[in-house]
């Protein structure tokens, strides 16, 4: 048995070396061109007669998910991505719905092209020109939608949008950044770019109608729905009970390391008030759920017709979905039909913390709910639960208003006693998930006000003892649209306004106890402490030998641990990276701030100079 384990460890070490080569080898040039997808209707759509009428007015809609710029200003691009983007597939579904409903009646058809820049290919000025020329050649109209744009992707998305706009192409932008940061909306509108604020389901029909009439507006936001509280005020959010489910595209899935994995959101919103998080301010604190039967039917179809075996429920907190029990019960039936089906999800600490009745506790409805949830999740095929624990220090948790991770009694306790209670709570979370065979993935932030230079080392050491399987570490970042961003901006504590650096691995704030160097060292200490070489070997041996988890949980932990081990050492956060980087040296960032980008792309050099490679490199204007 010992020899077998040694041989197994050697195998995984060799595999790790190969993965290191894939992760760390830059390929200069030789970039595969992205295949512009003309998304065909799904089987259901074909059955309902959604085929393109001939001849008809055709609008080719590009949904583009921008990448971001790396440290040297090059666009991040990988041969394989790590996770399909849910926004792209959800938006494609809206076009299909329009075609099913209106194509024949209105003699209008929407062609859909989805382009995920991180794995489909870098969009160069030549690409933009070719897209317009191809549309003209095919006799179709062109509409560009920058989709699901996060703050660290905004500079890249803005640059692409402005280049399309310079050629006279109508452009829209949506996502968390524009939904949470009015200043960027104002800038885009000044440039003639439409901003779509909030969720698109209730807006898309009106957007297309306005476009077809030649009256595309500069600003769209949700007007019909329910009122939901945020961290600051109230917003209107749409009900999603009957919202369209994402379109599965087999071509898109081949761009990812695991092409049998996809994503879906079954609910939206988050009831909590964490000050660093933008979810509650964009989607509200009122939980809304899709119809469970529709979700289960979609998953079954994905398994049967697209070979899907792994699913990521991208709900911000699936445990708080009002329909989780019905969905999990349905997924249990899917698991019986497709034994290889499994999924991961994001939940809060209470999802498993009270699945056991600890000494001195009396069983309550909270315990029964937690126990029911963990048992159903495991039976339905859950292999990993992502839990945002964020800090071990109760003072930090209270600062961030993340009260769900603390114990009410700790307000009367000394700090060390309160900290011990927090750690004990996290230990219960992990133990209860492991008891039902589910692995755990923690999210942890470094740089709260009560953190010091040793916060990374202490975090790694403690999280190892608690027995979290995977940990994603993040540098505390003032994301636009959050209470933290408003607070730090008012205090003058934001030292870096380049949105490209809001990726949770750059220092962008002043800190009373940490300078930039010690903060980055704490970040490195956390990663190298948790993902050390001894721990890599230990994980290979103990996880492969069993250790209380399901087979898919063990495989997932092995894959992710090795991937995280090397990805961090290559200077890339695993959640925003990919496999096998490809470097396009001919495409490099020129503009930093919004005004500089406007002068460059709309008022200045235009494409001739850009294509000749002229520019001023990295300018230092404020964002």
Where are these regions (language model features)?
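Acidic, low-complexity intrinsically disordered segments
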Residues: 4, 29-307
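A structural motif corresponding to the C-terminal end of an alpha-helix
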Residues: 94-110, 305-306, 376, 380-381, ...
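Flexible glycine/acidic-rich beta-alpha junction loops that bind and position SAM and/or redox cofactors
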Residues: 68-72, 178-187, 272, 322-323, ...
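Conserved beta-strand positions
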Residues: 63, 146, 173, 313-315, ...
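Structural recognition of alpha->loop->beta junctions
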Residues: 184-206, 371-384, 458-473
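Radical SAM enzyme core and accessory elements
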Residues: 2-63, 104-107, 129-141, 163-166, ...
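Radical SAM [4Fe-4S] cluster-binding motif and immediate context
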Residues: 48, 59, 239-441, 446-448, ...
């Amino acid at each position: 048995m010992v020899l077998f384990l040694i041989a197994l460890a050697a195998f995984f070490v060799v595999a790790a070396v190969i993965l290191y080569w894939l992760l760390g080898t830059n390929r200069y040039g030789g970039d595969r061109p992205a295949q512009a997808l003309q998304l065909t209707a799904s089987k259901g759509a074909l059955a309902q007669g959604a085929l393109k009428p001939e001849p008809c007015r055709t609008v080719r809609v590009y949904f583009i998910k921008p990448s971001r710029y790396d440290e040297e200003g090059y666009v991040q691009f990988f041969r394989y991505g790590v996770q399909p983007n849910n926004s792209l597939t959800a938006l494609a579904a809206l076009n299909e719905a329009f075609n099913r409903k209106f194509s024949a009646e209105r003699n209008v058809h929407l062609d859909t092209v989805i382009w995920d820049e991180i794995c489909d290919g870098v969009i160069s000025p030549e690409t933009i020109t070719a897209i317009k020329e191809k549309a003209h050649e095919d006799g179709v109209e062109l509409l560009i939608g920058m989709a699901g744009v996060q703050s660290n992707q905004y500079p890249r998305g803005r640059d692409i949008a402005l280049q399309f706009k310079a050629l006279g192409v109508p452009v829209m932008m949506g996502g968390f950044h524009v939904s949470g940061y009015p200043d960027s909306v104002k800038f885009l509108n000044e440039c003639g770019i439409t901003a779509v604020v909030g969720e698109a389901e209730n807006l898309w029909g009106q957007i297309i109608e306005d476009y077809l009439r030649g009256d595309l507006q500069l600003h769209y936001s949700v007007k019909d729905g329910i009122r939901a509280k945020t961290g600051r005020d109230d917003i209107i959010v749409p009900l999603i009970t009957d919202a369209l489910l994402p379109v599965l595209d087999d071509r898109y899935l081949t761009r990812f390391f695991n092409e049998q994995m996809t994503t879906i959101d079954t609910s939206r919103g988050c009831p909590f008030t964490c000050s660093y998080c933008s979810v509650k301010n964009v989607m509200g604190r009122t939980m809304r759920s899709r119809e469970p039967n529709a979700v289960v039917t979609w998953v079954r179809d994905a398994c049967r017709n697209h070979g899907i075996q792994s699913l990521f429920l991208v709900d911000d907190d699936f445990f708080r979905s009002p329909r989780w029990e019905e969905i999990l019960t349905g997924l249990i039936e899917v698991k019986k039909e497709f034994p290889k089906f499994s999924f991961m999800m994001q939940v809060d600490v209470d999802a498993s913390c009270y699945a056991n009745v600890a000494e001195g506790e009396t069983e309550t409805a909270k315990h029964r709910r937690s126990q029911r949830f963990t048992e159903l999740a495991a039976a339905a095929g859950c292999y990993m639960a992502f839990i945002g624990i964020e800090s071990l220090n109760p003072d930090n948790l209270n600062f961030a208003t993340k009260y769900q991770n603390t114990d009410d009694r700790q307000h009367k306790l000394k700090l060390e006693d309160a900290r011990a209670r927090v750690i004990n709570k996290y230990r219960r979370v992990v133990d209860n998930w492991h008891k039902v065979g589910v692995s755990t993935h923690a999210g942890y932030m470094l740089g709260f006000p009560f953190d010091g230079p040793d916060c990374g080392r202490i975090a790694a050491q403690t999280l190892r003892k608690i027995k979290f399987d995977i940990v994603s570490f993040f540098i505390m970042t003032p994301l636009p649209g959050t209470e933290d961003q408003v607070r730090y901006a008012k205090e003058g504590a934001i030292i870096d306004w380049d949105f490209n650096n809001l990726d949770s691995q750059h220092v962008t704030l002043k800190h009373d106890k940490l300078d930039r160097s010690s903060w980055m060292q704490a970040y490195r200490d956390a990663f190298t402490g948790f993902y050390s070489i001894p721990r890599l070997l230990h994980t290979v041996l103990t996880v492969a030998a069993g250790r209380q988890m399901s087979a898919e949980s063990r495989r997932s932990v092995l894959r992710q641990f090795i991937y995280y081990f090397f990805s961090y050492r290559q200077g890339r956060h695993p959640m925003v990276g990919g496999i096998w980087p490809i470097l396009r040296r001919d495409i490099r960032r020129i503009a930093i701030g919004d005004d500089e980008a406007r002068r460059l792309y709309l008022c200045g050099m235009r494409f001739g100079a850009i294509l000749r490679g002229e520019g001023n490199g990295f300018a230092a204007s404020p964002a």
